[in-house]
Structures are given as structure tokens and as C-alpha cells.
């Protein structure tokens, strides 16, 4: 079973301001085309995946929900997730269940029931329960066109 680092996620007050800062400090910019050139809207906010020299940084700008609570508690730019990509999320799910770990459907701690992953842009993912107030581990399976 393949397991690779995929990205880190940061909660931010403003994707635009954070992008401006990253551009000024490090010359980081969104690609001109493709999946990684887009800012995506979702029910509780928006996000962008920013490729930086082979590493991806996900900027999450919440407007509601558990990530907004995390932002208020931890502050702008706080690391909220460390994501690992797997080639078979079903096997990874089974492995964690056998270990007595219940995968979560969302950052808020909602248990994932009967493998009903919430697909986002073809990706399947779940979280592992957080210990304390730190970042969550996210487990992700991507469709071939996004790898």
C-alpha cells in the first residue's frame, strides 16, 4: 500500500492577502492554468491548492464551521492539517478500523459511517481523530488526473 506526503493545510483570514504575502516573500504564484490555478468555493468557505517546488500548500479561508473555530482559536496561518495520499483509501480505512481508530468525515470530528466519503473534485478523503488542539491528519485518494 502506497503512502506519500501530499500537502499541508493552513487556515487563513484571506486567501488573497496570504497569496500576496507569499508572492512578495517567496515569489510564489498560482499557475496560469489547470486544477491548481483555481480558488474553489464550498459551503463553509473557500480553498486553493498552491504548488510550491513539488510541495503543495492548501490555503483554507473558512466562513463558518469547525475550521472557522480553529482559525479564531489558533490564528491566521495556523497549520490545520497534514495530508498523506494513499493509492487505496478502502484498505487504509480497514487498517485504521482494525486498529480501533474511527476515521472521521470532517475536521469537526463527525465519524465516517459506512465509507461514505465526501468526494471533492474526484478525491476521496477522511481525517483521523485529533489529539489535543493540533493539526489533523488527512488521508486522501486522488483520481489519476490530479496526481
Regions found by a protein language model. Give the residues of each.
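N-terminal beta-strand motif that seeds the catalytic metal site of vicinal oxygen chelate
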Residues: 1-20, 79-84, 140-147
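Core segments of cupin and vicinal oxygen chelate
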Residues: 2, 10-56, 92-120, 128
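Long, charged/polar, surface-exposed segments that mediate recognition or autoinhibition
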Residues: 71-100
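Histidine- and/or cysteine-centered catalytic micro-motif in compact active-site loops
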Residues: 15, 62-64, 87
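A short, polar/proline- and glycine-enriched secondary-structure boundary/capping micro-motif
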Residues: 25, 68-72, 104, 147
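Internal, well-ordered alpha/beta segment that forms a basic, Gly-enriched binding/recognition surface
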Residues: 123
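Amphipathic N-proximal alpha-helical interface segments
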Residues: 59-66, 137-140
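Short loop/beta submotifs within extracellular cysteine-rich repeat domains
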Residues: 29-30, 67-68, 133-137, 146-147
Amino acid at each position: 500500500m502506497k503512502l506519500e506526503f501530499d500537502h499541508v493545510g493552513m487556515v487563513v483570514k484571506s486567501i488573497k492577502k496570504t497569496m500576496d504575502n507569499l508572492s512578495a516573500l517567496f515569489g510564489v504564484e498560482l499557475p496560469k492554468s489547470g486544477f491548481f490555478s483555481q480558488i474553489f468555493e464550498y459551503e463553509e468557505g473557500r480553498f486553493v491548492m498552491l504548488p510550491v517546488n513539488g510541495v503543495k500548500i492548501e490555503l483554507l479561508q473558512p466562513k463558518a464551521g469547525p475550521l472557522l473555530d480553529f482559525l479564531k482559536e489558533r490564528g491566521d496561518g495556523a497549520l490545520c492539517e497534514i495530508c498523506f495520499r494513499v493509492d487505496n483509501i478502502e484498505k487504509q480505512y480497514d487498517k485504521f478500523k482494525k486498529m480501533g481508530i474511527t476515521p472521521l468525515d470532517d475536521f469537526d470530528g463527525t465519524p465516517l459511517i459506512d465509507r461514505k466519503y465526501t468526494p471533492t473534485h474526484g478525491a476521496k478523503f477522511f481525517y483521523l481523530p485529533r489529539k489535543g488542539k493540533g493539526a489533523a491528519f488527512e488521508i486522501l485518494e486522488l483520481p489519476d488526473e490530479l496526481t
